[in-house]
Every structure is written in C-alpha cells, then in structure tokens.
C-alpha cells in the first residue's frame, strides 16, 4: 500500500513539473531569458528522477521489471524522452531536443495516466510468456530505440519544415527583387542571404543531430530485435514467426536502414534522407501502438494489455 501511494505521488509530481516546464521553455525560446532556461532544464532533471523513482517503486512492490504492459511501457518511454533531454545539458551541448522531448514526455505520460489505462495502473502478476530473463533486455532496448528514433525523426521533420519555408521565401523574395529598385535590391539581397545562411546552418545542425540520434536508435533497435529473436526461440521454438509485431519491427528496421544508406550518400543527404526519417516516424507508432489495436499475434495479450 505504501509503495502504491508513493508511486501515485511521484506520478503526479512528475506530471506537474513537466506541465510547468513546457510553457517555461516556450517563454525562453521567445524571450531568451537565461534564468528561465536553466529553470526549465532543472525541471526536466527533476521529472527524470521522479519517473525513475516511480519505475523503481513499481519494480520493488511488483517483483518484476515494470515493462509488462502498455502503462508501464509508456512510463518507460516517457522516462526515455526525459533522459534524452537531459544528456545534452550535462554534456554542455546546445539542446536541440528540448522542444521535442518535453512535449513527447508529457504526452506519453498523460496517455499512460489517462482513464483508458486505469486497469493497468495496478501491477499484476506476469503472464507465463513474460516470465523470462529476456524481458528486461528485449523490451528496454525496443523502447529506448523507439524514443531515440522518434526524437531523430522529429528533428528530420523540423528540418523539412525549415527547408520548405526557406524555399518559399527564396522564391518570394526573388520575384520581389525583380520588380524593385536597384539600391533596394541590394539591401533585400543581403537580408535574404543573411537569413538563408543562418537557416542553412540550422538545417545542417539538425541533420547532424538527427543522424546521430537515429544511428543510436537504429543500433538499439537491432539489439532489441536480436534479443527478441533469442527469446522467441526459447519461448516458442522459432527465432522468427512473422506475426504482426515482428513484421512491423522488420519494416521499421528496414526504413531506418534505408535512412542510414541515404544519409551516407552525399547526393541524398538533407531533405531526401529527412523524408525517409519522417516516414519512419509513422512506422514506429504503427509498430509500437497500432499493431496491438489492429492485429493479433504472439505479441498481443488482449486490448491495451501489452505492447512490446
């Protein structure tokens, strides 16, 4: 009872903190207030430790790693987003993930604590299929890979939006320059060039970090799939069964393998590889969440009960 109460308290504290962090971060993005920026980063650190405490508490009183159902996997996914958020802070890097990770963490945690998953808030005994030492290895790797791939894909989507807007601005400004006076043309040209240079720098940085994060996520996804294959062989006598979850995991892996190939090809870098990553964003959600709603297979343990 004490552990359940502590888990409940930590859930509400983490959700409340991150609810304050998001508008604070938006204010710092607009007004560049250093104090508020530092406050929002510390808020995400506090959120990370609250969710960590929540998962550890649930682990202690349930007797098994908290990765057995959709509620627990969503809380772990929220923890993963928080972890990705605070890594640049401790390594003194400019945080390009902040506008992505904080909303992602609150949305996943918000859905996890919603009325749809109320029955799963109380920990239950593991079903026989999940009573394996491979549970922690396989599911944690898959969820960490989802978090990394989602963040990298969102950076790629941001890159596409900036590139698309830049192209529109260039076309609009070019047409305007053709009908303007010569002296005004020079001023406009310098302004457009200056803005485009900074946008170019931003897109290059987004492309760089997107590639690094997706590369990490792809590695974790590969480890997760391989460990799942070993577990499947122990549980069902076959390394691969082509059930809906496994099929979509393979599709996800293939999409990001294609991304890795396009990203290493100089002629396909930038917008082309970002389009592939954007497609991957949708594929991940189908693999993680949609398959259990639309399909049945060895990984489906009833509606809203398991998603690994």
Curated annotation (Swiss-Prot):
Summary of subunit composition and partner proteins: May interact with Ccs1.
Gene Ontology annotations of biological process type: cytochrome complex assembly
Matches recorded under InterPro entries: Cyt_c_assembly, Cyt_c_biogenesis_CcsA, Cyt_c_biogenesis_CcsA/CcmC
Organism: Nuphar advena (Common spatterdock)
Name of this protein: Cytochrome c biogenesis protein CcsA
Family membership noted in the UniProt record: Belongs to the CcmF/CycK/Ccl1/NrfE/CcsA family.
Gene encoding the protein: ccsA
Pfam family of the protein (one): Cytochrom_C_asm
Alphabetical keyword list: Chloroplast, Cytochrome c-type biogenesis, Membrane, Plastid, Thylakoid, Transmembrane, Transmembrane helix
PANTHER family referenced in this protein's UniProt entry, alphabetically: CYTOCHROME B_B6 PROTEIN-RELATED, HEME EXPORTER PROTEIN C
């Amino acid at each position: 009872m004490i552990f359940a109460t502590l888990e409940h308290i930590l859930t509400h504290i983490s959700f409340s903190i991150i609810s304050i962090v998001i508008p604070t971060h938006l204010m710092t993005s607009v007004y560049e207030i250093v104090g508020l920026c530092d406050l929002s980063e510390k808020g995400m650190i506090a959120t990370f430790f609250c969710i960590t405490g929540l998962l550890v508490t649930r682990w202690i009183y349930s007797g098994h790693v908290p990765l057995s159902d959709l509620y627990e996997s969503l809380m772990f996914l929220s923890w993963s987003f928080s972890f990705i958020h605070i890594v640049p802070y401790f390594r003194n890097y400019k945080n390009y993930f902040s506008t992505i990770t904080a909303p992602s963490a609150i949305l996943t945690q918000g859905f996890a604590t919603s009325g749809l998953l109320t029955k799963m808030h109380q920990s239950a005994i593991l079903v026989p299929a999940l009573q394996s030492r491979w549970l922690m290895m396989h599911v944690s790797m898959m969820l960490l890979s989802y978090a990394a791939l989602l963040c990298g894909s969102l950076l790629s989507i941001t890159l596409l939006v900036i590139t698309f807007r830049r192209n529109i601005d260039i076309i609009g400004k070019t047409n305007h320059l053709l009908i303007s006076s010569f002296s005004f043309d020079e001023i406009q040209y310098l302004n457009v060039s200056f803005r485009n240079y900074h946008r170019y720098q931003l897109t290059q940085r987004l492309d760089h970090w997107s590639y690094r994060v997706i590369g990490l996520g792809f590695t974790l996804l590969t480890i997760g799939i391989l460990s799942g294959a070993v577990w499947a062989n122990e549980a069902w006598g076959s390394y691969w069964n082509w059930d809906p979850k496994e099929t979509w995991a393979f599709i996800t892996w293939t999409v990001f393998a294609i991304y890795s190939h396009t990203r290493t090809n100089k002629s396909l870098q930038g917008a082309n590889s970002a389009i592939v990553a954007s497609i991957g964003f949708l594929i991940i959600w189908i693999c993680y969440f949609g398959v259990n709603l639309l399909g049945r297979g060895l990984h489906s343990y009833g509606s809203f009960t398991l998603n690994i």
